[in-house]
Amino acid sequence: MTTIFDLLGKDADYLLNHKCVIKKEALTLPSGDLVSRVFAESDRNNRVLRSLQQMFSCGRLGGTGYLSILPVDQGVEHTAGASFAKNPMYFDPENIVRLAMEAGCSAVASSYGVLSILARRYAHKIPFLLKLNHNELLSYPTTYHQIFFSQVEDAYNMGAVAVGATIYFGSESSSEEIVAVAEAFARARELGLATVLWCYLRNPHFVVNNVDYHTAADLTGQADHLGATLGADIVKQKLPTLQGGFKTINFSKTDDLVYSELSSNHPIDLCRYQVLNSYCGKVGLINSGGPSGQDDFAEAVKTAVINKRAGGMGLILGRKAFQRPFSEGVRLLNLIQDIYLDPTISIS
């Protein structure tokens, strides 16, 4: 049987024994009492605390302070055909929820249509996270503009415990999206719902000399900081792959200490800088799994190890799981969860 160590391959020592530049003692780290220890001291009402605790208590990671969320909103974001042609069973929303339940996930995140059509059957069995806004791909030329497909009240009425939204920070529509999401999240808190923000970057000026800085630790870290500023309980971010975005794009501001004292080029240090920007871990960082490819198991394991050792709160992984046979999707999600359950894989 292939082990986590086998899947890490030549990177095993590099990832498992790294010591971070920013010490873990500077962070608020995931633990079973996280809701009581962190959020109970905030202005969040008791119903929000209950909703958060439902996610942190569900599935194989229940009681650990970590989350394993299955997100399937790609039918809107990337078109249904592109998302489900490899595995047509997921055109049926019920199989999305079944996958999350069978794999022992903390929650299932999807669109209003997917979750509402199954709410009476499943909302009391697994936490629902309603994704409120989406970017659709039928318009030409392609634009990056998140549009609300549903309202916070829809989440409340179907029995969801949380709402999610995306902001394309840096895009032409970012100011409009910030205002809309701030209003939606304020309403969600009134209704007792937890909030998760997809803190993505979209700006053509973030690509310089054919180098894409949309996954730079400094730029994505600032997006996380903006998400925390909006009051998100959890921020979702792509795993950082490089550093120095601010130094290259020639606008906005940074400090040389960011690169000399607060991070390095090691992937765990890059991810830790994201955690640092998420209020030193008080707002949980979950990283995304990315698209499906030939080495999904190895890539997913590395992403989980990096996130955990950096002080992150878990993974929100979709395409790698549902664009393969059902049983393999369950196995992949369980493998990721095993990393967060393994006490020998420690926070750096």
Curated annotation (Swiss-Prot):
* UniProt KW Cytoplasm keyword: yes
Q: Which reaction does it catalyse?
A: beta-D-fructose 1,6-bisphosphate = D-glyceraldehyde 3-phosphate + dihydroxyacetone phosphate
Q: Which Pfam families match?
A: DeoC (PF01791)
Q: Which residues form the active site?
A: 236 (schiff-base intermediate with dihydroxyacetone-p)
Give the EC number.
4.1.2.13
SMART domains linked to this entry: DeoC
**Superkingdom of this entry's organism?**
Bacteria
- GO cellular component terms? cytoplasm
What is its subcellular localisation?
A: Cytoplasm
NCBIfam families listed in its UniProt record: PRK09250.1-2, PRK09250.1-4
Similarity remark: Belongs to the DeoC/FbaB aldolase family. FbaB subfamily.
Protein name per the record: Probable fructose-bisphosphate aldolase class 1
Query: What's the source species for this entry?
Result: Chlamydia trachomatis serovar D (strain ATCC VR-885 / DSM 19411 / UW-3/Cx)
Q: What is the lineage of its organism?
A: Bacteria, Pseudomonadati, Chlamydiota, Chlamydiia, Chlamydiales
